[in-house]
């Protein structure tokens, strides 16, 4: 079976997933590919492990940005692909191989058939953490080429190929990591009265955290606290001196994020007093909500609805986190879901997006940026 050039690129990238700010092979792959393109109208910069590319327009009055994230996840792949990850314990399980490939496809199309306006492509590292969008946005490398508008996409396993799903306004939630370390006093299991058991303290803390959302967030708003990992103790007959909770917070409103964190801190202070222990809270990486510019999103959806190869869906907001929200906070633009029809979802070891979505997305986005970038 013959596959397209860009499907092959996706397969190449799929084999070399790398974690945040470690995407050296991916960066080099992108740079090597760019060297194959006509270069008289291209300028290239590197930023950490990312790549920024400017395609100079024929008669520019504005700059249109396209952002593609590059990093993978610490997941052991179970797809059965012949082109599965060659990096042990790492996988492109969130579609960033698709995102980067589509970006390279759009770059190729616009280099070979330039539009009037300038285009800037942001191949961004570390979306999965610790977060690359905000520092890239604030970097000296981007200041000179900062777009006037920007767009990005994310694959959506639940939608069929040919589907574009988005909405005006809030699309993705505010998110924050959550790490809580408890330290008490260890001891022999036979003498619990001489120790402060951090397994018990952690258990009480998990239970009490369940009240934060149900009793402190407006039922008409949405928020989630999930504790996904608990560690503590060393062996079965020693009372644990330390324990650690790892989780995530997600809220639709900025106000709810502050309220949730205030309540978490109050509950943790109560645990410290009740169990005579010390606690440290770390919120890790925090991502701003993805808020689509209303007018640009409406215009984009109207344009897409005229394409007979695309089905446009107005979706609901999701509790998904995306550091692209920082870019949209500073630059008007939007993000949309791209249907890839996979039985397994994002962050799953068996995620298998339909590669037919790649060339269709490139063709559609090329038509959109031509239309948008040639308007006066």
UniProtKB/Swiss-Prot annotation:
Keywords: Amino-acid biosynthesis, Diaminopimelate biosynthesis, Hydrolase, Lysine biosynthesis
Entry annotation: catalytic residues: 69, 128
Family: Belongs to the peptidase M20A family. N-acetyldiaminopimelate deacetylase subfamily.
Organism of origin: Bacillus cytotoxicus (strain DSM 22905 / CIP 110041 / 391-98 / NVH 391-98)
UniProt key word Hydrolase: yes
Pfam families attached to this UniProt entry: M20_dimer, Peptidase_M20
Catalytic activity, EC: 3.5.1.47
UniProt-listed GO biological process terms: diaminopimelate biosynthetic process; lysine biosynthetic process via diaminopimelate
Protein name (record): N-acetyldiaminopimelate deacetylase
Catalytic activity: N-acetyl-(2S,6S)-2,6-diaminopimelate + H2O = (2S,6S)-2,6-diaminopimelate + acetate
GO molecular function: N-acetyldiaminopimelate deacetylase activity
NCBIfam families linked: amidohydrolases
Pathway: Amino-acid biosynthesis; L-lysine biosynthesis via DAP pathway; LL-2,6-diaminopimelate from (S)-tetrahydrodipicolinate (acetylase route): step 3/3
The keyword Amino-acid biosynthesis is assigned to this record: yes
């Amino acid at each position: 079976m013959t596959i397209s050039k860009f499907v092959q690129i996706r397969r190449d990238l799929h084999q070399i997933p790398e974690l945040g700010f470690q995407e050296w092979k991916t960066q080099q792959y992108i740079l090597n590919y760019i060297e194959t393109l006509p270069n008289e109208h291209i300028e290239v910069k590197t930023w950490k492990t990312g790549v920024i590319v400017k395609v100079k327009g024929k008669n520019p009055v504005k700059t249109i940005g396209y952002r593609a994230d590059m990093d993978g996840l610490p997941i052991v792949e179970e797809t059965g692909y012949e082109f599965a990850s060659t990096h042990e314990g790492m996988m492109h399980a969130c579609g960033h191989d698709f995102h980067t490939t589509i970006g390279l496809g759009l770059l190729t199309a616009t280099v070979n058939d330039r539009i009037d306006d300038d285009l800037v492509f942001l191949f961004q590292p570390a979306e999965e953490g610790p977060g690359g969008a905000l520092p890239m946005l604030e970097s000296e490398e981007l200041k000179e080429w900062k777009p006037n508008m920007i767009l990005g996409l994310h694959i959506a396993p639940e939608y069929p190929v040919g589907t574009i799903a988005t909405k005006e306004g809030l699309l993705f939630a505010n998110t924050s990591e959550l790490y809580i370390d408890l330290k008490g006093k260890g001891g022999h299991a036979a003498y619990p009265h001489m120790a402060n058991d951090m397994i018990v303290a952690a258990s009480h803390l998990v239970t009490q955290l369940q009240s934060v959302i149900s009793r402190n967030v407006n039922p008409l708003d949405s928020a989630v606290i999930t504790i996904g990992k608990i560690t503590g103790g060393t062996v079965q007959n020693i009372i644990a001196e330390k324990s650690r909770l790892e989780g995530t917070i997600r809220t639709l409103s900025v106000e709810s994020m502050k309220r949730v964190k205030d309540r978490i801190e109050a509950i943790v202070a109560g645990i410290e007093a009740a169990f005579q222990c010390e606690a440290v809270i770390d919120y890790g990486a925090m991502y701003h909500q993805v808020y689509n510019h209303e007018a640009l999103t409406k215009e984009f959806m109207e344009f897409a609805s005229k394409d007979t190869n695309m089905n446009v869906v107005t979706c609901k907001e999701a509790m998904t986190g995306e550091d692209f929200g920082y870019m949209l906070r500073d630059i008007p633009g939007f993000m949309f879901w791209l249907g890839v029809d996979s039985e397994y979802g994002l962050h799953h070891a068996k995620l298998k997006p339909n590669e037919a979505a790649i060339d269709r997305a490139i063709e559609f986005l090329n038509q959109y940026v031509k239309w948008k970038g040639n308007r006066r």
